[in-house]
């Protein structure tokens, strides 16, 4: 998979989780990305943001030592940049 394929799959997962309150992050990467995604779309999509944050929180309740700073998530390459995450996820959430 290319970096764009990985990014696209992660955005699709964020979009799906944002619309379904019962989801939980599957791993550390998802939990940290969901947390960031929740923060960057909160003003435009408060309901979806809440779903993402809850999915992240459920994972971190079982794995509290796996929470990373925003800078570390970007450094690891899980997110290219916060503005890019916001723009691309907002587009997916808007057009569904």
Residue ranges of model-derived segments:
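Charged, low-complexity interaction regions
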Residues: 19-28, 40-50, 63-71
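Small side chains
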Residues: 27, 31, 37, 55-56, ...
């Amino acid at each position: 998979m290319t970096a764009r394929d990985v990014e696209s799959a992660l955005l699709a997962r964020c979009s799906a989780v944002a619309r379904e309150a019962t989801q939980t992050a599957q791993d550390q990467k998802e939990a940290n990305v969901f947390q960031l995604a929740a923060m960057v779309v909160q003003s435009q999509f408060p309901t979806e943001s809440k779903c993402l944050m809850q999915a992240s929180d459920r994972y971190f309740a079982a794995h509290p030592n796996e929470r990373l700073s925003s800078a570390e998530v970007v450094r690891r390459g899980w997110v290219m940049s916060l503005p890019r995450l916001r723009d691309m996820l907002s587009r997916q959430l808007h057009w569904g």
